[in-house]
Amino acid sequence: MAETFLFTSESVNEGHPDKLCDQISDAVLDACLAQDPDSKVACETCTKTNMVMVFGEITTKADVDYEKIVRDTCRNIGFTSADVGLDADNCKVLVNIEQQSSDIAQGVHGHFSKRPEEIGAGDQGHMFGYATDETPELMPLSHVLATKLGARLTEVRKNGTCAWLRPDGKTQVTVEYYNENGAMVPIRVHTVLISTQHDETVTNDEIAADLKEHVIKPVIPEKYLDEKTIFHLNPSGRFVIGGPHGDAGLTGRKIIIDTYGGWGAHGGGAFSGKDPTKVDRSGAYIVRQAAKSIVASGLARRCIVQVSYAIGVPEPLSVFVDTYGTGKIPDKEILQIVKESFDFRPGMISINLDLKRGGNSRFLKTAAYGHFGRDDPDFTWEVVKPLKWDNKVQA
């Protein structure tokens, strides 16, 4: 057998303090966009024992009750008493929100006077999109499995299957891969790690048995598990104190979990709490669509796309494509197809991906269990765009 290697991705649940903050920031964004699609939002959240603070810059015509959004979001996750890590109805909620800087406003959207194609990037930066043919979602398997384990933990907590579960939790999956001329081929799951918050009533043996039966079995396809697969289930031995009581939380601290689980690359910009003029978010969404479309159209088995911006400038400074040697045609030709097929100007990304539409918990949904590889019509950047190319070269 050819040489293999191990690669690991992690995820965290919606009750993890950093993810709680991401969800609050995006719930605020949803509320602003629902009433005023031109809202300019940069909303950060932090939390620690018995306290949540939202702060940042928001310019909107929307009438938003920030405190209610904070409490509702915490409650929906399951933070309903100090015992589980936070009491949504009795915790302190601090709000420190100002208008967007007038310097930024004039440079980016001319105080709302610019046409969509003229709107400049809200900041400088570079973003990456990635896709791989190893899963139906065109996402890395290690990341998909870690993410789905986290989502399943929440599901069995909320539906009562595992009543001992509490909201906070982390997952991690190590996959053994084979490199097939640049494409990634998963062979087996090497290690599964789950650390989940629990109540006082349950033993470690019960935790391990329940996690195997109700979380791991429904999520990880049998073909990837064998007698050598290693399981670390609550290896610390005790995880009763969790949520913001256990650790402080901040928006934007789980950017690898939000994207590709360590695969591809990351420009460093977080997503949650940002309206689509912030290219950290909209730029990353359009390059995911580009990379996914390249793989889905058969141009390559694996692909990364980079885009970069300057503040106030609509046109991207650079676009880059690398297919890791899996391209059916040269990368420079694929790059040309990408440039002809996708409009990377922030105002046009907003229109083409319908990113000004809030409500329906649209962005709140992105803030837990990943922004990519999700089968949901609100995730417009996951729609494959047919790319025109002459695939006779395959023969």
Swiss-Prot record:
Chief location of this protein within or outside the cell: cytoplasm
UniProt KW ATP-binding keyword: yes
EC number, UniProt record: 2.5.1.6
Record-listed Mg(2+) binding positions: E10
Keywords on record: ATP-binding, Cobalt, Cytoplasm, Magnesium, Metal-binding, Nucleotide-binding, One-carbon metabolism, Potassium, Transferase
One BP annotation, GO: S-adenosylmethionine biosynthetic process
Residues holding K(+): E44
Residues reported in the UniProt entry to bind ATP: H16, D168, G169, K170, S236, G237, R238, F239, D247, R253, K254, A270, K274, K278
Pfam families to which the protein is assigned, alphabetical: S-AdoMet_synt_C, S-AdoMet_synt_M, S-AdoMet_synt_N
Subcellular location: Cytoplasm
The keyword Metal-binding appears for this protein: yes
Comment on bound cofactor: Binds 2 divalent ions per subunit. The metal ions interact primarily with the substrate. Can utilize magnesium, manganese or cobalt (in vitro).
Domain of life: Eukaryota
Functional pathway: Amino-acid biosynthesis; S-adenosyl-L-methionine biosynthesis; S-adenosyl-L-methionine from L-methionine: step 1/1
Residues annotated for L-methionine binding in this entry: E57, Q100, D247, K278
Family: Belongs to the AdoMet synthase family.
Function in brief: Catalyzes the formation of S-adenosylmethionine from methionine and ATP. The reaction comprises two steps that are both catalyzed by the same enzyme: formation of S-adenosylmethionine (AdoMet) and triphosphate, and subsequent hydrolysis of the triphosphate.
Subunit: Homotetramer.
HAMAP family in the record: S_AdoMet_synth1
NCBIfam families: metK
Name by which UniProt lists this protein: S-adenosylmethionine synthase 5
Gene that specifies this protein: METK5
